[in-house]
Amino acid sequence: MKNYILAIFLVIGMVNANAQVKTSAQEVAPELVKQREELKTLIITNYLGIKNSLVVSDSKKTAAAASEFSANFGKFKFKKLTLEEMNAATTARKSIKELADSIAIAPSINEQRKLMEKLSEKFWVIIDKVKPENMPLYQQKCPMMGTTWVSNEKKIENPYYPKNMLTCGEVIAEK
């Protein structure tokens, strides 16, 4: 009988210990969520920095924004994915980082634009995983040239042909 009562107290003690662990994990989670959202916002801001620098044809700012994008994107950890999704996302991240690094060292604005076309296509594929909450993003396309880019507004500012076709484009998707 004593062993039975002792076992009950042990089980109650274990349940209480688990409840305390859960409470402590719940207290940490909001801070981690906040940090993750801040990193997502920074990644999108860095991407938009590349795009906007290309719109004004500033090769140096484009290179700096690409370096920041690469560094911050490299810190991002994908969450809640199946093994197959994780493999695809990890492969995409590697490719996107390599493209951003190439933009940062590209010798000309035209080369940066060519690389940005590839980066934008790959980035849109995983945009759901890096998009901050409550931030609408738009995939835009220049129908004459077939190039796409991501923007945080519906207004068209074509980063690939700003001199001749600044407003050439349309929103083709929204997330």
Residue ranges of each PLM-predicted region?
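Bacterial Sec-dependent N-terminal signal peptides
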Residues: 1-25
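Mature extracytoplasmic or organellar-lumen-exposed domains after removal of signal/transit peptides
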Residues: 25-175
